Amino acid sequence: MTAPLLILAYGVIRLTDPDHGPGPVWTTGHLALTAAMLLFVPVFARLWALARQDAGRAGRLSAGTATLLGLAGTLAVTVQACIDLQVGFRAADRPAMERLFEQVQSHPGVVPAVYGVGPLLFYVGLVWILVQLSARRRVGFWSPLAAVAGTAVAAAGGLDLMPLSAALFCASLAPLTRRRPAGGPSGRAGEAPVRLTAVRW
């Protein structure tokens, strides 16, 4: 899938610049991250469609809540990436970037919304909806486990372990890479349960 692949690309690109200062590497990496977040919108839409398929009222409510949380987190990370891009364009060196970041983060609500709780919602929404899909056997049981592992790696290792975290998210989202058959057990075209059979990112 393109979205997690771009996160992987961001993580690898970031590791090539130990100074993390303004320049082509910073810009390229954050453009990849921005594109990844934008592409996660249809990913969450696909997960939502799978989770609510043949689900009861509670299942649909759960899927909708998880999707909204995931999209809110996606928005927060996108805003953060755009801020990073803008700072990179304006600053001449890393100290100048730090001063600009301080100015941005001095505004009330920016830190929790864009750098704190906001981005965490991406992980919460993704794990939540994958757990729901696994409970209904739409994906393998280890799909949400891979997402949890990816989240744990990101939390423990920070951005330096982003490539490993992205690879785990690749595994968790692999079911979405399968082409749906024309019909399935539900009797409706294109709505066969998706099983985890291969890892592709």
Which residue stretches match the model-derived regions?
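Hydrophobic, aromatic-enriched alpha-helical segments typical of multi-pass transmembrane helices
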Residues: 1-201
